[in-house]
Curated annotation (Swiss-Prot):
Residues 15-127, 174-453 form a coiled coil. Disulfide bonds: none annotated. Keywords: Coiled coil, Cytoplasm, Cytoplasmic vesicle, Endosome, Golgi apparatus, Metal-binding, Zinc, Zinc-finger. Zn(2+) binds at C495, C498, H511, C515. GO terms for cellular component: autophagosome; cytoplasm; Golgi apparatus; nucleus; perinuclear region of cytoplasm; recycling endosome. One of its GO terms (molecular function) is K63-linked polyubiquitin modification-dependent protein binding. GO terms for biological process: axonogenesis; defense response to bacterium; Golgi ribbon formation; protein localization to Golgi apparatus; regulation of canonical NF-kappaB signal transduction; vesicle localization. It comes from the Eukaryota. Its main location: cytoplasm. This is Optineurin. The lineage of its organism: Eukaryota, Metazoa, Chordata, Craniata, Vertebrata. It comes from Danio rerio (Zebrafish). Residues 222-237 have a biased composition (Polar residues). Residues 216-237, 454-488 are annotated as: Disordered.
Length: 517
C-alpha cells in the first residue's frame, strides 16, 4: 500500500526537472523580452536624436537660404538705385557738355571780336606813331617794323586761335574739345599779357619821344630867338603851336590807349576767372566720369555676384529638396518602426502572462527583422551623412561663400541665439522624455502590480480546492489493483507532488510554483 502511494511521488524529480527547465525558459524569455525592449528603446532614442539633428540642420539651412535671399534682394535694390543714378549722371553730363559747348562758342565769338577791335586800335596807334616820327624826322623804322611785325604775329595768333577751335570742335570728342578750348584761352591770356607789355613799352617810348620833342622845341625856341629874324620867329611860333597841338593830340591818344589797356586788363582778369571756372568744371567732369566708371565696374561685379548667388541658390534649393525627400522617407520609416514597436508592446502586454515557444520564435523573428530594418536604416542614415558631408564640402568650395566669409562673421550673434533656442528646445524635449520615461515606468509598475494582483487572485481562487491535499490518497487500505487504477486515472491538470487537481493549465503552473517553493 505504502509503495503504491509513494510511487506517484517517486516520479516527481522528472517532472521537477521539466518544471525547472520551463521556469528557466520563462526567465530567459523574460530577459530576452527586456533586452528587446531596451534595444527598441535605445533605437527609438537614437532615431529621435537623429531626427532632431536633421530638423536643426534643416532650420540652419533655411536660415542661410533666407539670408542669401535677403542679400540678393539688397543687391537688386542697389543695382536699381545705381542704374537710376547712372542715368541721372548721364543726363547731367549731356547737359553740361551742351551748355559748356554753347557758352564756349559764344565766349569765343566775343573774344574774337574784342581781339579784332584791339588789333585795329593797335594798328591805328602804330600808324599814328610812325606818322609822328616821320614828321619829327626822328622816326625809327626798325622799331616800327618790329611793332608791325608783332602786330602781324598777333594777327596770325588770332587767326590760329580762331581756326583751331573750329577744327577741334568737329574732330575731337567733347571732353578733349573742352580741354583744347581751355588751353586756347590760356594762350589768348598769354597773348593779352604780351600785348599789354608791348603797349606799356610803346607808351614809354612815346613819352620819351614827347620829352625829346619838347626839349627840341625848347632848343628850337631858344635858337630861333637868337638867330632868326621876326619872320622866322613867326614861322617858328606857328610851327611850335602845331607841334603843341600834335602833342596834345598824342597825349589824348595815349590816354585812350591807357584806357584800352585798362579794359584789356579787366578782360584778362575776366578771362582768367573764366579759365579757372572751366578748369574746375573740367575737374568735376573728370571726377564724375571716374565715379561713373567706378559705378559701372561695381554694377558689373554685382551682376556677376548676383548670377553666382542665383546659381548657388538654385543648387541649394535642389539639395534641400533632396534632403527633404530623404527626411520624409526617414519619417515614414520611423513611424513604421514606431508602429511595429507599439504592436510589439501590445502583444507583449497581452501575452506577458503566458509566453509560448511559438510566440517566442515569432518575437525573435520579428526582432531579427526589426534589427535588420534598423541596420538598413542606419546604413541609409550613414550614407546620407556621407552625402551631407560631401555637400557641405561642395558648399565650402563655392567661391561666393568664401567671399562672404566676413559677412557670415557678423551673423555670429544671430547664430548663437539660434543655438540657445535649439538648446532650450533640447532641454524641453529632454524634460518631455523624462516625463515619458516616468509614465512608462509607472505603467510598467502598474502592469507588474496588476500581474501580481491577478496571480494572487488566481492563487486565492485555487487554494480552497487544495485545502485537503491528502484527499485523493485517503483510502490507504484499498487493494493494489484499486491504487493502480487510480494512478492510471490521474487527470491531466493534477499536481505531480501533492496530487491536487486543478481546472486549467494556468492554475496548475501557479500551484506548481507555490508547491515547489
Amino acid at each position: 500500500m505504502n509503495g503504491d502511494i509513494s510511487h506517484p511521488r517517486g516520479s516527481g524529480p522528472g517532472n521537477l526537472g521539466s518544471l525547472e527547465e520551463t521556469l528557466q525558459q520563462m526567465n530567459t524569455l523574460i530577459k530576452e523580452n527586456r533586452d528587446l525592449k531596451e534595444a527598441l528603446k535605445q533605437t527609438n532614442l537614437s532615431m529621435k536624436e537623429r531626427f532632431e539633428g536633421l530638423s536643426a540642420w534643416k532650420e540652419k539651412q533655411k536660415e542661410e537660404r533666407d539670408f542669401l535671399e535677403q542679400r540678393l534682394e539688397e543687391a537688386r535694390t542697389r543695382l536699381n538705385t545705381m542704374d537710376v543714378e547712372n542715368e541721372a549722371l548721364k543726363n547731367q553730363v549731356k547737359e553740361l557738355e551742351k551748355s559748356g559747348a554753347e557758352c564756349l562758342h559764344t565766349e569765343l565769338e566775343a573774344l574774337r571780336g574784342q581781339i579784332l577791335r584791339i588789333q585795329a586800335e593797335k594798328n591805328d596807334l602804330v600808324a599814328m606813331n610812325s606818322e609822328l616820327q616821320l614828321k619829327m624826322g626822328q622816326g625809327s623804322p626798325s622799331n616800327s617794323f618790329i611793332e608791325i611785325r608783332i602786330a602781324d604775329d598777333d594777327l596770325k595768333v588770332t587767326k590760329d586761335l580762331s581756326s583751331v577751335p573750329e577744327a577741334s570742335a568737329f574732330s575731337m570728342p567733347k571732353a578733349e574739345s573742352e580741354e583744347q578750348t581751355v588751353r586756347q584761352l590760356l594762350r589768348s591770356l598769354r597773348a593779352e599779357t604780351d600785348e599789354k607789355e608791348r603797349l606799356q613799352l610803346t607808351l614809354q617810348e612815346a613819352r620819351g619821344r614827347i620829352a625829346e620833342l619838347e626839349s627840341k622845341l625848347e632848343h628850337a625856341d631858344s635858337s630861333a630867338q637868337t638867330s632868326l629874324p621876326s619872320a622866322a620867329e613867326t614861322n617858328a611860333s606857328t610851327e611850335v603851336k602845331n607841334l603843341e597841338d600834335q602833342l596834345l593830340k598824342l597825349c589824348n591818344e595815349l590816354k585812350q590807349a591807357q584806357i584800352k589797356l585798362d579794359e584789356a586788363e579787366s578782360m584778362k582778369r575776366n578771362l582768367q576767372d573764366r579759365c579757372k571756372d572751366l578748369e574746375q568744371d573740367l575737374g568735376t567732369l573728370k571726377t564724375q566720369l571716374g565715379d561713373k566708371q567706378k559705378v559701372q565696374a561695381e554694377n558689373d561685379c554685382l551682376k556677376v555676384q548676383m548670377e553666382s548667388l542665383q546659381a548657388a541658390i538654385k543648387l541649394e534649393q535642389k539639395k534641400t529638396q533632396d534632403e527633404k525627400n530623404n527626411l520624409n522617407q526617414l519619417k515614414d520609416a520611423y513611424t513604421k518602426l514606431f508602429e511595429d514597436y507599439s504592436e510589439l508592446q501590445e502583444e507583449k502586454k497581452k501575452r506577458e502572462s503566458c509566453v509560448s515557444k511559438d510566440d517566442y520564435d515569432e518575437l525573435q523573428t520579428r526582432f531579427a527583422t526589426a534589427e535588420k530594418a534598423l541596420a538598413d536604416k542606419q546604413q541609409k542614415i550613414d550614407e546620407m551623412k556621407m552625402e551631407l558631408f560631401q555637400k557641405e564640402k561642395d558648399l565650402e568650395t563655392i567661391s561666393v561663400f568664401q567671399a562672404q566669409a566676413e559677412i557670415y562673421s557678423s551673423d555670429f550673434y544671430a547664430e548663437r541665439a539660434a543655438r540657445e533656442k535649439i538648446h532650450e528646445e533640447k532641454e524641453r524635449l529632454a524634460t518631455q522624455l523624462e516625463y515619458v520615461k516616468k509614465q512608462n515606468s509607472q505603467l510598467q509598475e502598474e502592469m507588474e502590480s496588476l500581474g501580481r494582483h491577478s496571480m494572487s487572485e488566481m492563487q486565492r481562487r485555487h487554494v480552497p480546492r487544495g485545502a485537503n491535499p491528502q484527499g485523493p490518497t485517503a483510502p490507504n487500505n484499498l487493494p493494489g489493483g484499486r491504487g493502480e487504477w487510480q494512478q492510471q486515472n490521474i487527470p491531466d491538470h493534477a499536481c505531480p507532488k501533492c496530487g491536487e487537481v486543478l481546472p486549467d493549465l494556468d492554475s496548475l503552473q501557479i500551484h506548481i510554483m507555490d508547491c515547489i517553493i
